[in-house]
Amino acid sequence: MWENGDTLDANDVYYTWKMILDPKLANLRASNFANDAIEIVKAMDYFQGNASWDEVGLKLIDDHTLEIHTVSMHNPTEVMIHLAHPANCMINEEYYEKGMNADRTETMYGTSQEQYISCGPFLVENWVNDAEITFKKNPNYPFADRIWLAGINIKVVEDSSTQMQLFENGEIDYVQLSTSNYLKYEEDPRVLLAPYNSVRHVVVNTINPEKPILANEKFRQALYYGVDRENLASLTKQDPAEYIVPTTHMMDLNKNITFRDTEEGKANRKENYGYDPEKAKQLFDEAISEEGLDKLTLTMHYSDTELMAQMSEFLQQSWPKLFGADRFELKLQAMPANQLSQVKRGWQTNPASYELSWGGWVGNDLAPWNAFKYWTSFYSNKNEPFINEEFDKVFNAANFADDRFDEGVRLKEVAEMERLLIEPANVIPVTQDIYKYLKADRLQLSTNGYVNRIGFAWDYSKIVE
């Protein structure tokens, strides 16, 4: 139930779904809900203004029953994966409508304590914007007997040195470590490590009219083979990655087999993590000759964090050293993450919006075939202008074809999608990040380390004095 005592039932779910797809609200996650692990009948058409709500495959039957009509058949796992997406987080109709503006294009819901109502394992007790949010245990939560904490206090602290000071003073119980802080605590037994569900990669704007060489496959391959991933990862305390599918992505959950464990996954790996300086120089020479250039200068945009500065500066130094400083120069431009997202996605209206940047999509660990949606032609928030008919075809087959459940079919399709991205260097994978946390001794985890799709389960931990 909601914290005010109102029942949370199918009506709330139905209203949530309708608001996700509302054409006027233009929710950025609408496409994730309309067509992701499952494709809902006419959902995307409704969002784009090409169908009525009555045509959408979402039906409210009664207070406890909903029907979802999909374009193709799906198994229960696919449906559960789809409904576990953050786009399905329940919203309260009364509060959502109370915060709506006059033309129904925006709502203030979720922007302050007065504009929000809780229903989960914890309830908002105090909310000070840009400072802290205090939660208390929800006694009416269906699984309240599994919640040991009396509450949670989240502090908003941007400066990493201040975060560490709060931890050392005993004012917070866990903190995520930056690279520099991790180096100081690397041998501390309180450190928790786990692979991150994402591969950081260089994003290439292949349609930039001011830098046509970015459309040259040999040039992109030169950048790919010219990345010394092992040394970079050693510097930034990550794992080198010449692949796109992270090590966390499972092909067979029952057998605990990841894609990278399979023969197909191993076949997409390269020696020395893809670093081949001689091949890179040869490809660079051929590409720059084909484009009629004597020297090339590119700009890389990156988010203004310690890690991304380190990674960008590494490439700024290593690529000119490899290709020749008199022939290649990489300029860097830092900016806030939200501004960077706008710049990257700006290629759709301004093809010259950027040249090189960074990406790192987080996909579903249990459905690696679905995680490739970010590179399909129909994904609405694409970072780069990669549009490939063959890629779309393989993606649709892996996610919707009748034979996708047959032995080995999806495995081959995942391998093929990864190959279509990496072989022509449409994206340039560099590292797979590692979660780095420092945990107070009094905080006892309910898990034996990091668990796929659950993490460290902080909400289910205990305080043991």
Q: How should these model regions be labeled?
A:
Residues 437-465:
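Long beta-strand-rich cores associated with HINT superfamily self-processing modules
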Residues 233-236, 273, 327-342, 368-442, ...:
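Extracytoplasmic/peripheral linker and loop segments enriched in polar/acidic and small residues
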Residues 70-74, 81-147, 151:
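Gly/Pro-rich hinge or "lid" segments in bacterial periplasmic/extracellular proteins
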Residues 1-36, 67, 213, 409:
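Aromatic- and charge-enriched surface segment that lines or borders ligand/interaction sites
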Residues 14, 28-99:
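Surface-exposed binding/hinge segments that line
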Residues 129, 273-363, 373, 435:
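Ligand/substrate-recognition segments at binding pockets and active sites
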Residues 240-286, 304-310, 405:
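Structural transition elements
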Residues 110, 140-185:
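Ligand-site clamp/hinge motif
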